[in-house]
């Protein structure tokens, strides 16, 4: 009888490790949400390096098992969200922030905490449970919610607030990279006016005005959005629907907008944007993910994940070729892709 070969080579061990990692990939997502929900980065930020027992006293929980919380923090250290150092006097272990967890502190300019709470919301997981159905043309968000993402957001104050906080957080976070890209390539040279379509709270518009004082900037969004935002005296605010009309300007800005839509709707939006431009010299400025960009390859996984996420929402993240085809169908004469220090790129389309 042949003796079973129980030897496992390095490749098989690596394969096992890969499958185990993906099998429990959900754990990192849930732990990320949990640490933000508990405010652990905020606690350490406000109090400096803290011991486990000190950290427990600040948690928003009625009671906490020290042993279980130790296991909890051990996993977060493994995720490189926190580090452990030993106090030279007391010899106690203390937890400190890492560059990653510094991005999870609420209220900072560079905080992704609100975006984490949006992307890890239980309703997001509910939609992802229908991912296979997207392959035969179904719309997972509809299947999960019996409505579109936009109707759900408008009709649910809690979700609406989470979404708006996340969008404001993300815009604030990537604004320096956007402004730097616009400056480096002189994108706003000769531009006296710009409309930020879907500009929400006006974070990006305010950043543009501060960096380019010669530009008059307007924020356009749906009526219920414009009604609730705190107005900035440096900006004009316009309630409207981008599928109907866009105010005239030298440049139209669409940040993280077109990825919400399939090609036909994008072409409609782009055509309306083009109608708002002057007969010569106008430009549409897109801030969107370019899936196959060679810029910042560390973001490749995130870009591909966003591509899947937007597909579930009946949207689409696009490659260089797909952006080129889309802009050509919308009759733009040329375009330029500008890599920036962010997950997105700037795409300037010339009319």
Curated annotation (Swiss-Prot):
Report the enzyme's class at the first EC level: transferase
Question: What reactions does this protein catalyze?
Answer: columbamine + S-adenosyl-L-methionine = palmatine + S-adenosyl-L-homocysteine + H(+); (S)-tetrahydrocolumbamine + S-adenosyl-L-methionine = (S)-tetrahydropalmatine + S-adenosyl-L-homocysteine + H(+)
- Lineage, top-rank taxon, reads Eukaryota
User: Quick one: which pathway?
Assistant: Alkaloid biosynthesis; palmatine biosynthesis; palmatine from columbamine: step 1/1
Supply the PANTHER family for this chain: O-METHYLTRANSFERASE (PTHR11746)
Question: What does the record note on quaternary structure?
Answer: Homodimer.
Q: Which InterPro entries match?
A: COMT-like, O_MeTrfase_dom, Plant_O-MeTrfase_dimerisation, SAM-dependent_MTases_sf, WH-like_DNA-bd_sf, WH_DNA-bd_sf
Q: Which Pfam families match?
A: Dimerisation, Methyltransf_2
Q: Report the active site residues.
A: 259 (proton acceptor)
The record lists the organism as Coptis japonica
Single GO BP term: methylation
Query: Listed GO molecular functions?
Result: columbamine O-methyltransferase activity; O-methyltransferase activity; protein dimerization activity; tetrahydrocolumbamine 2-O-methyltransferase activity
Query: What PROSITE patterns does this protein map onto?
Result: SAM_OMT_II (PS51683)
Q: Which UniProt keywords apply?
A: Alkaloid metabolism, Methyltransferase, S-adenosyl-L-methionine, Transferase
- State the name under which the record lists this protein: Columbamine O-methyltransferase
The residues that hold S-adenosyl-L-methionine are 198, 221, 241-242, 255
Q: What is its EC number?
A: 2.1.1.118, 2.1.1.89
Q: Into which family does the record put it?
A: Belongs to the class I-like SAM-binding methyltransferase superfamily. Cation-independent O-methyltransferase family. COMT subfamily.
Q: What does this protein do?
A: Catalyzes the conversion of tetrahydrocolumbamine to (S)-tetrahydropalmatine and of columbamine to palmatine, an isoquinoline alkaloid.
